[in-house]
Amino acid sequence: MASPMKSDFLAGSHMKLPKIGIAAAVAVVASIVIYLALSSFFVGTDEFKNDENQSIKEYPDNTRFMRFTHGKQLSKAGEDLAGSEPYLVRNGKSKELVIFAPEHLQEFHRKDANSHYKPENMNMGDYAGQLLGQCVGQLGGTKWKLARSHMDPEFSYRASRSMMKRFSQEIDSWVSHLSENPTRRSTQKDVFVQDVKKRCKDLSLRSIAISIYGETFSEENYAFLSTMNELHEKIIFVAFLNKRVMSKWYNKLPTAEKRLMDSFQTQWKAFNLAQIKLAREKKLSCPAEKIYVGVEAGDMSLPEFLQSLDEMLFTNIDITGSILALIFQHLAKDQAMQKKLRAEISAHRAQPGYTVGDYISKQNTLLHFSLLESIRVTPAMYFTLPECNASPKRIGGFHIPAHTPTIVDVNRLNKNESIWGTEADAFRPERFFGLDPARYRFGFVRWGIGRDKCLGKNMAEVILKLAILAVTDKYTLHVPPALPGQGEKSEAGFTINRDVEVEFRPAI
């Protein structure tokens, strides 16, 4: 029997329905609501079949945390489970497709790449979404185009070239202090061992901050951003490893996690608005201030602006720092390659009209290929963040429905033997000589794929190459004796947490 409130509502709307009709209508509406709710969280596995009606394999455990803490083990487990076929993993309540072969990636991006989109909050829940859910890397459609129209000019190839002098000054200063506070000392004079991941992270923070804040950047800013980076790392740890913060209702409660997020967002907003004000009052060149014009024009929201700068700075600090540290480690392990690189650098410097800008801009040098090879062999992340296809696909023989969140096993893709040969695990930069980039277009994830390539790609390449030149000018790199317990660490973060120690000896 309908309640008085329901009867009053129906009477007020002048509708006359039989009681059984009301019940049926309510049941239909409830069914639709339940269906929509479930379909927004689950991908139906019935659709994931091949032509023989065999279902795609599914990894049994929730991978929400382990893809960040045990990525290498998950990659191997996925290969053991499905072999050369794509497979499904669970990320909380969502299911995601894992692809890892060039043909998988090519089909995933075929025809509808420009219509791909990112799942809400990266499929990581409300807390992660509060931090980065509205950054430019997570936007799509018109919002993405408008945001990129304001951001791209400030991080273009041309803009990165204009920052070279400032980057060089910062890098030279960093190299001059590299011997301070070593992790280990040597009995040999001026020889020391350094935790290069930590030191390279410091350089990344300074350099990327300069690319964002330009002439407003100061030592005071550096100290503040260092503190903010520590706060950001705590938030990332909570977002990745705390199930409770996936709920937006939990995040409304006065918890320690909420206080952490509120503190970061309040300080981050105040800092950036202060930099914009300073740039305008003092007439200083500041890329962040130029991007902020997009907020004033209504093309970007303030959260989109702030989260995009967060993505550019705090996320990329870890990635850029890891890439640089691993290049030094690879060169330390391969003395022959290190000598060849030094010889190339000397040969280019001896050429008439040589400029460092022209050299680091070349895409066919051992310097450039050493950078690519290091990223290929030791990627900063084992798995990408999810991205959804707009139309149905046929990947690895399986029928993949539209709107399937998909992640890439970067380590397996970057070492696919069909492109890189049987020695795909080896650090061999010379393999790129004579290799048409079109050959590995879908077989190598470095700065992202398609239109969503890293916004800071141009700046990162300049910083990384200038740092390699500066370090190899002053030092030769060597492998120190290993200490017990060194290796990859099972800790949460955007990048793989590795011990990266290098021994530095004065260059002769």
UniProtKB/Swiss-Prot annotation:
<dbReference type="InterPro" id="IPR050121">
    <property type="entry name" value="Cytochrome_P450_monoxygenase"/>
</dbReference>
<keyword id="KW-0503">Monooxygenase</keyword>
<keyword id="KW-0479">Metal-binding</keyword>
<feature type="glycosylation site" description="N-linked (GlcNAc...) asparagine">
    <location>
        <position position="416"/>
    </location>
</feature>
<comment type="function">
    <text>Cytochrome P450 monooxygenase; part of the gene cluster 23 that mediates the biosynthesis of a family of 2-pyridones known as leporins. The hybrid PKS-NRPS synthetase lepA and the enoyl reductase lepG are responsible for fusion of phenylalanine with a hexaketide and subsequent release of the stable tetramic acid precursor, pre-leporin C. Because lepA lacks a designated enoylreductase (ER) domain, the required activity is provided the enoyl reductase lepG. It is possible that the dehydrogenase lepF also participates in production of pre-leporin C.</text>
</comment>
<dbReference type="InterPro" id="IPR001128">
    <property type="entry name" value="Cyt_P450"/>
</dbReference>
<dbReference type="GO" id="GO:0005506">
    <property type="term" value="F:iron ion binding"/>
</dbReference>
<dbReference type="Pfam" id="PF00067">
    <property type="entry name" value="p450"/>
</dbReference>
<keyword id="KW-0812">Transmembrane</keyword>
<dbReference type="GO" id="GO:0044550">
    <property type="term" value="P:secondary metabolite biosynthetic process"/>
</dbReference>
<dbReference type="GO" id="GO:0016020">
    <property type="term" value="C:membrane"/>
</dbReference>
<feature type="glycosylation site" description="N-linked (GlcNAc...) asparagine">
    <location>
        <position position="53"/>
    </location>
</feature>
<protein>
    <recommendedName>
        <fullName>Cytochrome P450 monooxygenase lepD</fullName>
        <ecNumber>1.-.-.-</ecNumber>
    </recommendedName>
</protein>
<keyword id="KW-0408">Iron</keyword>
<keyword id="KW-1133">Transmembrane helix</keyword>
<feature type="transmembrane region" description="Helical">
    <location>
        <begin position="22"/>
        <end position="42"/>
    </location>
</feature>
<dbReference type="InterPro" id="IPR036396">
    <property type="entry name" value="Cyt_P450_sf"/>
</dbReference>
<dbReference type="GO" id="GO:0016705">
    <property type="term" value="F:oxidoreductase activity, acting on paired donors, with incorporation or reduction of molecular oxygen"/>
</dbReference>
<dbReference type="GO" id="GO:0020037">
    <property type="term" value="F:heme binding"/>
</dbReference>
<keyword id="KW-0325">Glycoprotein</keyword>
<comment type="similarity">
    <text>Belongs to the cytochrome P450 family.</text>
</comment>
<feature type="binding site" description="axial binding residue">
    <location>
        <position position="454"/>
    </location>
    <ligand>
        <name>heme</name>
    </ligand>
</feature>
<keyword id="KW-0560">Oxidoreductase</keyword>
<keyword id="KW-0472">Membrane</keyword>
<dbReference type="GO" id="GO:0004497">
    <property type="term" value="F:monooxygenase activity"/>
</dbReference>
